[in-house]
C-alpha cells in the first residue's frame, strides 16, 4: 500500500480550499507544500488546521491521518 504524501492530501482538497478553510492565503499553503509539513503550531496545539482540512476533504482523510502525514520528515 502506497502512503499518501502531504502534498497529495493538500492538492486533492485543493490549495485554495485549504487556504479558505484555514483562514490563510494560498501563498501560506504553498509554503507548507515546500516544507512538506504542517506548521509547528499544529503540533503544539495552537492551531487546528488538520481538523479543518479533514472536514474540507469530505471524509477522505481524518485529522489524525493529516497530522501524521503532515509531520516534517527529515531524511539524512
UniProtKB/Swiss-Prot annotation:
Keywords: DNA-binding, Repressor, Transcription, Transcription regulation. Gene3D superfamilies: lambda repressor-like DNA-binding domains (1.10.260.40). InterPro entries: Lambda_DNA-bd_dom_sf. The keyword Transcription applies. GO terms for molecular function: DNA binding. This is 8.4 kDa cro protein. It comes from Escherichia phage HK022 (Bacteriophage HK022). The gene is cro-HTT.
Amino acid at each position: 500500500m502506497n502512503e499518501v504524501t502531504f502534498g497529495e492530501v493538500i492538492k486533492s482538497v485543493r490549495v485554495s480550499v485549504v487556504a479558505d478553510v484555514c483562514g490563510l492565503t494560498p501563498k501560506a499553503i504553498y509554503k507548507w507544500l515546500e516544507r512538506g509539513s504542517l506548521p509547528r503550531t499544529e503540533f503544539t496545539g495552537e492551531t487546528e488546521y488538520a481538523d479543518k482540512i479533514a472536514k474540507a476533504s469530505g471524509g477522505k482523510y481524518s485529522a489524525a491521518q493529516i497530522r501524521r502525514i503532515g509531520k516534517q520528515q527529515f531524511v539524512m
